[in-house]
């Protein structure tokens, strides 16, 4: 929409005619229609402004950007102002309703559910009243005349109809609630693929081994590596000890002649000789030494 509107400029010049153009939710104004090609003097986005009419003058209206700016405008007559108000309001409503289809569906479903809930409350009140009426008919005192069959039938039919309507409305509420809370309406976006785990740094491994002493594989491996080296280092010492022990045993004679003799290096026919002399052999040798030698005849 486009046309002439008077715009308030200042106290010196007062109201000045301007050419206004409303396009795609933006209201732009120019000095005249011929100056449209030169560029606008100003523009207003309808989505962020409020429309206000003058309470006394039926040709004036205001466009207010909260906390920033006021635009005072006046039409030629009341009918022209009404045309502009309808166009500006429609443009603002179309721009304001920028919700997605899913959000609109949720909002409409919520409104429908609220309406059905209010209907249920109304039918519940009607049911209570009708049940109370029937109870009065049944428990009427003897001094009152007995209720007619027609009145009882009418009350019963009303109660039955109200119950049916209540049940139908309740079923509709359940359907709306199921549609409102269906999973696809609130489906979350798929999560991003997981990032491959990063191997821990040596510093982290040392911290873990310090905090968990039972699982220090690195220390065990270091100990197993150090042990062969120390064993190799001790091997020559063991050999030296064995050599020195055997040498000292061979060099020093036994103090007791009755003590068993150790033969470390003597062999008989390639086999090791007995390490000790049997007791019978020693006795035989002793008796032979004690017997006198007989002269040869």
UniProtKB/Swiss-Prot annotation:
The modification Phosphoserine is found at residue 244. Residues 215-224 have a biased composition (Low complexity). Residues 97-297 are annotated as: Interaction with VAPA and VAPB. Keywords: Golgi apparatus, Lipid-binding, Membrane, Phosphoprotein. InterPro entries: Boi1/Boi2-like (IPR045188), PH-like_dom_sf (IPR011993), PH_domain (IPR001849). Plays a role in regulation of vesicular cargo transport from the trans-Golgi network (TGN) to the plasma membrane. Regulates Golgi phosphatidylinositol 4-phosphate (PtdIns(4)P) levels and activates the PtdIns(4)P phosphatase activity of SACM1L when it binds PtdIns(4)P in 'trans' configuration. Binds preferentially to PtdIns(4)P. Negatively regulates APOB secretion from hepatocytes. This is Pleckstrin homology domain-containing family A member 3.
